[in-house]
Amino acid sequence: FWLDKYHIDGLRIGALSSMLYLDYGKTEGEWEPNKFGGKENLDAVDFVKRLNTAVHMYHPDVMMFAEENTSWPKLTHKIEDGGLGFDFKWNMGWMNDMLHYMSLNPMWRPFNHDSLTFSFYYAFSEKFLLPISHDEVSHGKGSLIKQMPGKYDEQFAGVRAFITYMYAHPGKKLVFMGTEIGQFDEWNHEEAIQWDLLEFEKHKKLRTFFKELNKFYLDCKPLYELDTVWKGFDWIHHDDYANSVIAFKRTDKNGDEIVSVCNFQPIRRCLLYTSPS
């Protein structure tokens, strides 16, 4: 119905773990194992496979997303290869790590450097989407800019650093509405986005930043062509804890490269890194 009548671009299956595991959120005695003695919900697995197959058959341009917070394997692999057939998995680990890291006073970030780099260890195990969704800017959590530490100007700088790093990181991008104008109030489904903020210079410049970054991203194939495989990524420097800096290289199918150097301290740096290649 949603695909046929409203022509939506994709479907997200939320809380997928509660479907896939018979014991999810239950204590001993509240669930029974499957016929093989395991905790996997075989009926749910079959339903998900059939759902993804049907969507891709009748609407091949529609994307299917999995929000799953465990390490269920092969969510985005082909069904014939033992997968569940989703197009992308929400990278909840990256999201939680980065929101925690960016909320820290910069002086504490050197002690939490692993939150910045850990996602690269599994970045290519699935086809990932990097999500900043409605869940992260509502329910008392505050908007993205409100979660940034420091004074007014520093919060805008925090958003720019976070989003630029997000666009350089392997994985597709999802940014929730209102983030692009620096809305300080968290999202409320009963209210509109506060477009009047664009009367203020900082908010207007932030929207321009998003506009230019999106254009740069679309024009820069190394940032997305090999988004799901190690071939498109190389570390240059990942353990500069003291300076809160990481550097890496992205590559496209033709071998063209772009280098990303991310500084998460409010201090100008002059650093020399040597690429392993």
Indicate residue ranges for each PLM-predicted region.
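Extended hydrophobic/aromatic segments used for targeting, binding, or gating
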Residues: 193-196, 208
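Active-site groove signature of glycoside hydrolases
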Residues: 3-23
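Catalytic cores of secreted or luminal carbohydrate-active enzymes
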Residues: 202-223
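Conserved small/polar residues in nucleotide/adenosyl-binding loops
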Residues: 273-277
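Conserved alpha/beta catalytic core and glycan-binding cleft of carbohydrate-active enzymes
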Residues: 7-9, 27-189, 218-222, 227-271
